Amino acid sequence: MAVLIFLGCLLGGIAIGLPIAWALLLCGAALMFWLDMFDVQIMAQTLVNGADSFSLLAIPFFVLAGEIMNAGGLSKRIVDLPMKLVGHKPGGLGYVSVLAAMIMASLSGSAVADTAAVAALLVPMMRSANYPVNRAAGLIASGGIIAPIILPSIPFIIFGVSSGLSISKLFMAGIAPGMMMGATLMLTWWWQASRLNLPRQQKATMQEIWHSFVSGIWALFLPVIIIGGFRSGLFTPTEAGAVAAFYALFVATVIYREMTFATLWHVLIGAAKTTSVVMFLVASAQVSAWLITIAELPMMVSDLLQPLVDSPRLLFIVIMVAILIVGMVMDLTPTVLILTPVLMPLVKEAGIDPIYFGVMFIINCSIGLITPPIGNVLNVISGVAKLKFDDAVRGVFPYVLVLYSLLVVFVFIPDLIILPLKWIN
C-alpha cells in the first residue's frame, strides 16, 4: 500500500504540473497520514535537516564556479585550445566539442551548464561550416552528459550524501568511465565525419597554438588543482568547491579581467537561483526518504528481488533496467534521491561494490538526460541550436545507442571501472 501511495502521489503531482520537489513533499505528507504520524513540525524539521550537511555545501560552490567560468572567459578559452589543435581535421569541430565538454566537465559538474556553454560557442560555427546541425547538436548534447561523470560531479555529491558513501571515491571512480565515454563519442563522430565528408577548418600555426595555450593555461590549471587536491588528500569535496569558485573568480577578475562587479552580481544571483532549486529538491527528497524507511519500502523491494540476491549479475541487470526506465522520464537528481535509499540496501546485501554501483547509477541516469521522451539536455540543445525537439532526437540517436552499448560493456566488465579506481588510489 505504501508503494501505491508514494507512486500515486508522485506521478499525480507531476501530472498536474507540480515541480518535482513539491511532488516529493506531497508524497511525504501522504505517507505521514497513512502511517498516522502527520505532524507539520516534524516535516519542517526533517526538511531543514535534509539540507543541513557539510558535504552539500560543495554544490553552491561548484555551481558558482561554473557560472563564473561562463561569464569570465574561462569557458571560451577552454574551447579555443582544442579548436587550434584538432579543428583542421575533417569534422574537427565535433572533436573540439567533445574535448571541450570533457575539460569543462572537470570544472562545472553540471550536464545542463556544460551543454549550454559548449553549444553557445560551437553551434554557430558548425552551422556556418555547413555541418548537419542536428548531428552536431546531438554530439554536443552527448558530450555534455559527461559532466556528471567526471569530477567534480554534483550528482555524485548528492548520491554520496544519500548513500553514505565516500564522495571523494565516487569522484575518482568516475574519471576512467568518463574518459571512455568521450573516446567512444569521438570514434562515433569520426565514423560519421568520414561518411559525410565534412569540411576542415584552417590549420593553426604553432604560434597560434602556443598563444591559445598560454591564454588558456589559467583555465586549464583548475582541474589539475582539483584532482591533485583530492589525490593528495589536501582537501575535501566541499573545500574543493570553495577553491574552485575562488580560483575561477581570481582568474576571471585579475588575470583575464573580463568580469566586472556588475557581471559578478548577476553571476551570484544566477548561482543562488540554481543552488536554491537543487537544495530544496534535496531537502524535499529527504522527507520522503525518511518516511520511505519508516514505511519499510526498502524491505519490500528487497523481499521482491530476494530470489535474485544469489545472482548478483542478474540482479544488477534488473536494477540497471529499472534505473534506465525511470531515468528516461525523470531528471537525474530526483532519480538519485528517490531510488538510492531504496536500492542501496539490496546492492550491499548482494555483495555488489557500492562505488561501482554509484558510478553506474549516475552514468545510466546521465544517458537518460539525452533519451526521449523527456531528455532535459535535449531541450537545452534544442533551444540553443534553434532546432525542433524531433530533429534533436534524430541527431542524438546514434550517440545514445553507442553510450547505452558502452553501459552494457560496463555491466559485464566491471573491472573497467573498479581497476582504474584502485590504480588512482
Model segments located where?
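Alpha-helical transmembrane segments of multi-pass membrane transport proteins
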Residues: 1-425
